[in-house]
Design a protein with these regions (language model features):
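Glycine-rich phosphate/pyrophosphate-binding beta-alpha loops
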Residues: 13-17, 45-59, 145, 213-214
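Active-site-adjacent loop/helix segments that line or gate small-molecule/cofactor pockets in enzymes
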Residues: 1-32
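Short solvent-exposed loop/turn micro-motifs enriched in small/polar/acidic residues
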Residues: 25-28, 95, 147
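Residue-level signal for well-ordered, solvent-exposed loop/turn and beta-edge residues enriched
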Residues: 40-41, 216
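Glycine-rich loop-to-alpha-helix module at the N-terminal edge of alpha/beta enzyme cores
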Residues: 41-129, 137
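Conserved beta-strand/loop elements of the cytosolic catalytic core of P-type E1-E2 ATPases, chiefly
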Residues: 94, 211-216
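Short, acidic, Ser/Thr-enriched surface-loop or helix-capping motifs
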Residues: 36-37
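PLP-dependent aminotransferase-class I/II
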Residues: 135-210
Length: 216
């Protein structure tokens, strides 16, 4: 069997009809370049999942991973460790005013789940607002928060999520023809949504400041 055949036979790919996929078989990557198993070099315009923004195999990142792996590879959350609090301090230095602590998770979707739980716990309110054409993850609550069609198969409509239209002048939901019109109408829409849903029922609004998977 070829590498591609073995990949398709053993790996379940997310967001894909398994019988129709034909993934590129990557051998290595460096900087902005990805090299396939057949030697083809491709310029990685998508930065993988829009996350390798300093390039592949950055020497400083590789060195730090190697150094840490030689000392400690995992630690239970009930323990303290220097690398973790140093990372937290760096994040807090660059975060918003008033940020006091960092809660580490395994990824973005888990971060969203915890953020929603915290918002509901501290407000006592059930609803969270999110925009259409958004992506917030693929676990229970985060996939309901996601605002594109990929959520449909798993959207139970019972997660206390309310969607609204965000600004999108290219295909405006508000029939706007200028940026000023789009901004004004896009701000009025969630305001009306909040009023009709009941302000006292809303725990949080989740937004992508820069649309990623469902926008770029």
């Amino acid at each position: 069997m070829s590498s591609l055949e073995r990949e398709k036979a053993s790996v379940f790919h997310s967001w894909s009809a398994q019988s129709t996929i034909s993934p590129l078989m990557v051998a290595s990557a460096e900087g902005v370049w990805v090299t396939l198993e057949d030697g083809t070099r491709l310029l990685d315009f998508s930065s993988q999942l829009v996350n390798t923004n300093i390039g592949h195999q950055h020497p400083a990142v590789v060195s730090a991973i190697q150094e840490q792996a030689g000392v400690l590879t995992t630690i239970a959350p009930q323990h303290g460790y220097q690398s973790r609090y140093r990372a937290a301090e760096l994040i807090l230095d660059r975060s918003f005013d008033g940020a006091a602590k960092v809660f580490f998770t395994n990824g973005g979707t888990e971060a969203v789940e915890h953020a929603v739980r915290m918002a509901r716990l501290h407000t006592g309110r059930p609803k969270v607002l999110s925009t259409y054409r958004s992506y917030h993850g693929a676990t229970a609550t985060s996939i309901n928060l996601t605002g594109d069609h990929r959520r449909w198969a798993n959207d139970t409509a019972s997660a206390g999520v309310v969607h609204f239209f965000g600004p999108f002048l290219y295909r405006s939901a508000f029939y706007a023809t200028t940026e000023a019109q789009e901004c004004e109408r896009a701000l009025a829409h969630p305001e009306a949504t909040i009023a009709f849903e009941g302000p006292s029922t809303i725990a949080a609004i989740i937004l992508e400041t820069v649309p990623g998977t469902a926008g770029i």
